[in-house]
Amino acid sequence: MANSKLEKSLGLIRKKIDLIDDQMLSLLEDRVSLVIDAENLKKNTSKGPFYRPDREKEIVMRLQSLNNSPLEDNKIRTIFQDIISACFSTAFEI
């Protein structure tokens, strides 16, 4: 009986995690699309440089200041640096 209740609880938690993962993927798709738009705008107006480390640092610091989760700031930095890098490299390849 207890095992069945545990499985049901785990199943509900996993469904919620899956929904969050779906939302995160959708937001990543939106983000990369906007980065592509920004890079195209820069290319068309010669407003370089395309990569701005100061902007990346600003984004990461802002997100770290908003962090209220158990995730440590260095993990927030790593996650978002990876996201920023993936979006930028995708935009640059197009």
Where are these regions (language model features)?
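Domain-level signature for soluble enzymes in the chorismate/prephenate branch of the shikimate pathway
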Residues: 1-94
